Structures are given as structure tokens and as C-alpha cells.
Amino acid sequence: VRIRPTRQQVLGLLPERLVLVRGPREPGALYLSFDDGPHPEHTPRLLDLLARHDARASFFLIGQRIEQHPALVERIVAEGHTLGNHSYSHPLFHRLSLREQLDEVERTDRLLADFDRSGPHRFRPPRGVVSLRLLLAFARRGRNLAYWSYDSLDYQPQPPDELAARLLQRPPADGDVLLMHDDSDCAAQILAQLLPAWHTAGRSLRALPAVAA
């Protein structure tokens, strides 16, 4: 059984201690999240942009890229953002056994702990594909899956201006978790247009809250 990325409604019915789809619905709160980094070219530009606008975010990192770019992970933490687990090699999770899936998670757990001395970190599955067996395994271990409630579509072959216009015309609701990616420059181009408007509107750009102990 696989729960597809378009089924946020289904995951949203599960307890938040198992799956986080939205953040606290405080007035103006919007939770930024970025997958697939760190990237040596695009992540620094994105961090510069977030710093200029006093915005915070959660970065769901790939283990192999953590090993390749540790200084970027250190910068993410130093600038007040939070870390999440996005597997070690970003494989097609549904083709792996449960043990192989957990190995991907645990290997990246160990890497992340070296940077922020915390854990276990929230895990966002590659491509958002969640299996029932992984949900059950996480429930037994008291682990937390992080999903999203608003997809920026920044991985689609659309001009950033069009994607930014969509977000302005249909803005995220308070508490929404916005899915973006920092393995390309698209997210930074979108946010360069959105962050000034959101701040003018009184929105607060935040990282996801820490996992409850």
C-alpha cells in the first residue's frame, strides 16, 4: 500500500506525533521547507535570501550531500534553521525492503546528529511516497514523518514567475507547510518575489517546530 504525494488529506487524519502535515495555525504563520539539499550553488543563495528577510526554514537533507558539503549544513544550523532527514541516497523508496528503508533513515540520522546534537529528526520520504509498512515502523519507534500541506511545484517545468503568481493568487493558509527544493535556483527566484509581499502582509516565515520529546 502506498500513499501518494497528492494524498495530504489522508495523512492529515493521522496523529501529529506520527505525521506532521501542518504547523501550528498561529495568525500569519507559514512554515518553509526545502528538500534535496544541500547544494553547493543554490543553497547558499537561498540562505542569503532568507537572511535578508529574517525568514527561517526547515531543510530536509540527503545524507550523501551532507557528507559532500558539511560546511553548508553548519551554516544552515548557525543561521537558525532546522534540519530534517530526507534519506541517505534519495532512492525510489517503494522499491526497497523495509530494512533498506530504515537503513537509509538511520544512516542520515547519524550524520545529522553531528551538526545539531539533536534527534531523532523529522523524516520526509523521497518523492513523498509513504508506505503503510514504513508508517507502522515509525509508529513503533515513536518517529515522526514530515509531509506538507502546500506544494510550490518548483520542480515542475514552469517559469518561476508563474509559480510565484500562483502562490500570490492562492496564498497558503496559516499553519501551512510549504514544499520547496534547494537543488535548483527556482525556489530562490520564487521567494525573491514572495518574501517582501508576505512580510508586508504580516506573515511570519518559520521553521517547523522541534519534535516533541
Task: Spell out what each predicted region is.
Residues 34-36, 61-63, 85-87, 125-127, ...:
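A cross-domain feature marking catalytic cores of carbohydrate-active enzymes
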Residues 39-42, 89-92, 129-133, 153, ...:
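Active-site environment of divalent metal-dependent phosphoester hydrolases
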